[in-house]
């Protein structure tokens, strides 16, 4: 015999989860549109200038550069975490003002960058970071800073282009990141639910 109370609760929970996903997707699309239309004031308003870097697969990446640095200063490139944007680094940008050239970028599918094809991988983000370096810091010393997914992006770049590390990339800072295997973590949830969380 089927327990109708339990079934009703399960359907209610599924309905709430579905509604939450739909609301989140719509809110993300609206926020991205507003960001692209310039409604938000963020890091660019603090003196940086924007450039677009187009990747080898045609995705346009939004990059902000703060050039207030002495000649020969390193370029510090910040890579944000999952579901964040280049606006994640205001304190760091301020602390480095006048000491280093600061580059902030929105990883694909985040902030004002284009989304690209479905199924984007961390390896792809590493290739994107290589394009950013080539476009906005083709010469000189580079320091890479990555938070969460941004740290994984840096590690993917190191795997993809190890020759950059040492001659060009002089230092790396990895903040609250992982060396991989994130998709295998179930967060203590049943497998189908854990897959939704990723």
Residue ranges and their predicted role:
Residues 75, 101, 141-143, 170-171:
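Structural signature of beta-strand start/N-cap positions in the alpha/beta core
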Residues 2-32:
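Hydrophobic alpha-helical topogenic segments used for membrane insertion/localization
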Residues 39-61:
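N-terminal cap/lid segment of alpha/beta-hydrolase-fold proteins
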Residues 80-82, 146-151:
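Conserved alpha/beta-hydrolase "nucleophile elbow" surrounding the catalytic nucleophile
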Residues 107-145, 149, 164-165:
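Active-site loop/oxyanion-hole signature of alpha/beta-hydrolase fold enzymes
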Residues 155, 159-198:
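Flexible "cap/lid" loop of the alpha/beta hydrolase fold
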Residues 59, 64-112:
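Conserved HGGG/HGGXW glycine-rich cap/lid loop of the alpha/beta-hydrolase fold
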Residues 88-90, 113-119, 183-186:
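Conserved catalytic-core motifs of eukaryotic protein kinase domains, centered on the activation segment
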């Amino acid at each position: 015999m089927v327990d109708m109370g339990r079934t009703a609760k399960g359907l209610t929970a599924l309905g709430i989860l579905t509604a939450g996903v739909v609301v989140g997707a719509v809110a993300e699309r609206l926020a991205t549109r507003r960001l692209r239309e310039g409604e938000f004031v963020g890091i660019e308003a603090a003196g940086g200038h924007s450039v677009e870097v187009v990747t080898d697969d045609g995705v346009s990446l939004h990059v902000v550069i703060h050039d207030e640095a002495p000649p020969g200063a390193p370029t510090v490139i910040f890579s944000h975490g999952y579901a964040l944007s280049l606006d994640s680094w205001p304190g760091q940008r301020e602390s480095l003002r006048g000491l280093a050239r600061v580059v902030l970028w929105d990883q694909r599918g985040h902030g004002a960058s284009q989304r690209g094809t479905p199924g984007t991988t961390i390896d792809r983000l590493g290739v994107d970071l290589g394009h950013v370096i080539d476009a906005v810091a083709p010469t000189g010393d580079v320091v890479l800073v990555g938070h969460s997914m941004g740290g994984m992006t840096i590690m993917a770049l190191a795997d993809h282009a190890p020759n950059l590390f040492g001659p060009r990339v002089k230092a790396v800072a990895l903040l609250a990141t992982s060396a991989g295997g994130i998709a295998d973590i179930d967060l203590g949830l049943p497998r189908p639910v854990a897959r939704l969380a990723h």
